[in-house]
């Protein structure tokens, strides 16, 4: 351990006495504890163990389950139905059985048996013959149909071909000129003008100043000297001038009150660095849950525990 501070082993905090955490299993000494027992005992390859049966199709080659029975692939359902109908037909010895008497009509609601009027023809369920419906025929045409849609083909539509009419370029400008000249010709004289001096509608502004303004005052520009200012006499030394005194400097006078000598506060004469007592060290601790799992499921009984997976 170095003279000052902690060692690297103490800083890590792993090299210390392990905690007394147990789940009730017996203690075996490290000397008698086997090392890598699974490498030379029991099976060398550990499989996944037994799997519980599942109704899913995962793990098979086909996505859907197919039934496979003996000679099922060679059966034809159509052929089997035909053979069954032939066997049933062979059981018929003669013709169909017909009773000696005909069907008796019921005497109840909806029948006309025993009534005076008998059945009404209009209420009969038989289909009434109807006359053959003749179609009215197509409409007759007064003129043969026109060919084409009419776009780009003259004299094909119902209306006649449009006759040519000239359209001068400056027609709108000429019409405007004619309207302006006709309007000016209707005017009798020129524009109406008054010979009076124009006046304002309201009183004059009393604050209006018609006289010319005085010239603006010129601001004197401050002159900036490039050369720094130097006083006429040199600067005085500290302490002032000593001319006229007996001594050039004042005589020394002792302090009336005695000054205490300060001592340096050093409690440790050897000047050693203070190290506090080390606190608790951190240690990697396994969880009790993981220890219980390792105890319950191990290399000896892993294949007897049913798997939860479906494949």
UniProtKB/Swiss-Prot annotation:
Pfam families: CFAP96-like. Keywords: Cytoplasm, Cytoskeleton. It is found in: Cytoplasm, Cytoskeleton, Microtubule organizing center, Centrosome. The keyword Thylakoid does not apply. InterPro entries: CFAP96. Disulfide bonds: none annotated. One of its GO terms (cellular component) is cytoplasmic microtubule. Belongs to the CFAP96 family. This is Cilia-and flagella-associated protein 96.
């Amino acid at each position: 351990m170095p003279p000052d501070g902690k060692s690297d082993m103490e800083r890590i905090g792993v090299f210390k006495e392990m905690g007394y955490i147990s789940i009730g299993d017996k203690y075996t000494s490290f000397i008698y504890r086997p090392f890598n027992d699974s490498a030379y005992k029991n099976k060398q390859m550990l499989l996944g163990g037994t799997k519980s049966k599942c109704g899913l199709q995962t793990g098979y080659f086909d996505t859907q389950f197919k039934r496979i029975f003996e000679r099922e692939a060679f059966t034809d359902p159509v052929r089997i139905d035909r053979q069954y109908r032939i066997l049933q037909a062979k059981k018929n010895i003669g013709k169909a059985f017909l009773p000696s008497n005909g069907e008796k009509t019921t005497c109840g609601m909806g029948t006309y048996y025993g009534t005076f009027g008998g059945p009404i023809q209009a209420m009969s369920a038989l289909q009434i013959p109807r006359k053959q419906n003749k179609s009215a025929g197509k409409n007759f045409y007064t003129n043969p149909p026109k060919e084409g849609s009419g776009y780009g083909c003259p004299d094909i539509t119902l209306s006649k071909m449009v006759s040519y009419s000239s359209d001068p370029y400056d027609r709108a400008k000429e019409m405007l000129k004619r309207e302006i000249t006709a309007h000016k010709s209707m005017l009798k004289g020129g524009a109406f003008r008054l010979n009076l001096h124009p006046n304002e509608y309201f009183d004059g502004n009393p604050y209006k100043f018609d006289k010319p303004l005085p010239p603006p005052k010129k601001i004197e520009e401050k002159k900036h000297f490039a050369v720094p200012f130097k006083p006429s006499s040199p600067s005085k030394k500290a302490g002032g001038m000593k001319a006229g005194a007996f001594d050039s400097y004042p005589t020394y006078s002792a302090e009336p009150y005695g000054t205490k000598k300060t001592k340096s506060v050093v409690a440790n004469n050897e000047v050693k660095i203070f190290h506090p007592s080390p606190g608790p060290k951190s240690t990697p601790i396994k969880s009790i849950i993981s220890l219980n799992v390792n105890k319950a499921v191990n290399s000896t009984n892993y294949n007897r525990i049913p798997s939860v997976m479906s494949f």
